């Protein structure tokens, strides 16, 4: 975005630490801090446990650069530690930038469309009249061959299904022929009272 500018803070390092003991054990944390205190006495640490990162703030950029040169990709407690210069974000304005007006008129149409805008005509639907004619000639139970088979292609045949009314009538006749099921009542279990009064 045009209003954001990333600059590097050369007096701060970000340490990517794979060992999570640094965030929980004070002895491990003291060992870690002693590595960097040799380069600068006025150093501060910020621990970000969920990101597995530590921000190390030096008093001057030279000691930060020296620490990065000496300690980058070194092992700490058996795992590799990587160091990077911290990035600071400078926002040019405290307000959000408005969106680019490329297709803004589609979201909220203005009183008149943009210059050069033309309405797109809808394409006419593709209707296969041969297929409609062939289907109209068919009756129930008949079949119609749309395309004859060749040596390389199969034939296309349409089979017309029987109407739903005939199926419904057959189902109704079967229901009438079946005897009505007799419902047998379930006997109530014997009741014996626990407390007699």
UniProtKB/Swiss-Prot annotation:
The keyword tRNA processing does not apply. Disulfide bonds: none annotated. The keyword Zinc does not apply. Residues 163-173 have a biased composition (Acidic residues). The modification Phosphoserine is found at residues 108, 112, 163. One of its GO terms (biological process) is calcineurin-NFAT signaling cascade. GO terms for molecular function: calcium-dependent protein serine/threonine phosphatase regulator activity; nucleic acid binding; protein phosphatase inhibitor activity. InterPro entries: Calcipressin, Nucleotide-bd_a/b_plait_sf, RBD_domain_sf, RCAN1_RRM. It comes from the Eukaryota. Residues 163-197 are annotated as: Disordered. Keywords: Phosphoprotein. Gene3D superfamilies: 3.30.70.330. Interacts with RAF1, PPP3R1 and PPP3CA. Inhibits calcineurin-dependent transcriptional responses by binding to the catalytic domain of calcineurin A. Could play a role during central nervous system development. PANTHER family: CALCIPRESSIN (PTHR10300), CALCIPRESSIN-1 (PTHR10300:SF4). This is Calcipressin-1. It comes from Bos taurus. The gene is RCAN1.
């Amino acid at each position: 975005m045009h209003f954001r500018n990333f600059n590097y803070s050369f007096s701060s390092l970000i340490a990517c630490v794979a060992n999570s003991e640094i965030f929980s054990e004070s002895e491990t944390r003291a060992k870690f801090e002693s590595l960097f205190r040799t380069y600068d006495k006025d150093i501060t640490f910020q621990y970000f446990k969920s990101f597995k990162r530590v921000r190390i703030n030096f008093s001057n950029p030279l000691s930060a650069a020296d620490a990065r040169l000496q300690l980058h990709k070194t092992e700490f407690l058996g795992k590799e530690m990587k160091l990077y210069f911290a990035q600071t974000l400078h926002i040019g304005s405290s307000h959000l930038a408005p969106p680019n007006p490329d297709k803004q008129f589609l979201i909220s149409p203005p009183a008149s469309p943009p210059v050069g805008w033309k309405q797109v005509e809808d394409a006419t639907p593709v209707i296969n009249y041969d297929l409609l004619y062939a289907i109209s000639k068919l009756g129930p139970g008949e079949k119609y061959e749309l395309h004859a088979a060749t040596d390389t292609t199969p034939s296309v045949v349409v089979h017309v299904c029987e109407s739903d009314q005939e199926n419904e009538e057959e189902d109704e006749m079967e229901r009438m022929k079946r005897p009505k099921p007799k419902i047998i009542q379930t006997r109530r279990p014997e009741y014996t009272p626990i407390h007699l009064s």
